[in-house]
Amino acid sequence: MTIETLPSQETRASLHAVMPAELPADAYGRRMVEALRAAGAGMTVHALPGPYPQVDPSAILAADIALARLPDGAPVLLDGNALFNLAASLPADDRRLRFVALVDRLHWADPDLTADEAAVRRNLEQGALSLMRRVMVPDDGTAAAVRALGVQPDRVIRAAADGGGAAALMAVLAAL
């Protein structure tokens, strides 16, 4: 039996976004996803359970499952708030999937963290960001902080979470 796709049922290649389920509506990643949708991009959001940006076993398991189910070569937007729970999964899939991080701030620099907690978070963020094909940031300060973690300058792209930023992100994804 052959199933034929009718022209009206054809869909464009979908983007995938992995982000915390409880991410506020005004968060950079969520606003960028909405800007992409408004620009006509097909989007599937994979929401991770648990608190963020804390490391959470349920979010780690959900991240492992979500990434394993994605098709080879899929463009995947990773919200920076989810990087702690994705860090263990990323090395297994960084050659198979096209990861782009949406980072509004680095969490390792949170002043409420102890020195040990900050060091752990810095290592997790640095390792995760090193596996990204590109890192999208909303401002120059965040771009400088990401570059300070060793991410190559040509991989860090400043883009507002609006129509212009969505167009810039779509151009980045098309070039990957």
Label every model-predicted segment:
Residues 82-83, 141-143:
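Alpha-helix capping/helix-boundary segments
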Residues 143-162:
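Helix-loop-beta element that forms the nucleotide-linked donor phosphate-binding surface
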Residues 164-176:
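C-terminal alpha-helical cap of glycosyltransferases
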Residues 52, 158-167:
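Short beta-strand->alpha-helix junction loop in the catalytic core
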Residues 1-50:
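N-terminal subdomain of nucleotide-sugar transferases
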Residues 75-77, 92-111:
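Active-site proximal beta-strand in glycosyltransferases
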Residues 116-135:
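Membrane-proximal helix-turn-helix segments that form the acceptor-binding/catalytic region
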Residues 63-87, 98-100:
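Short N-terminal targeting/anchoring amphipathic segment
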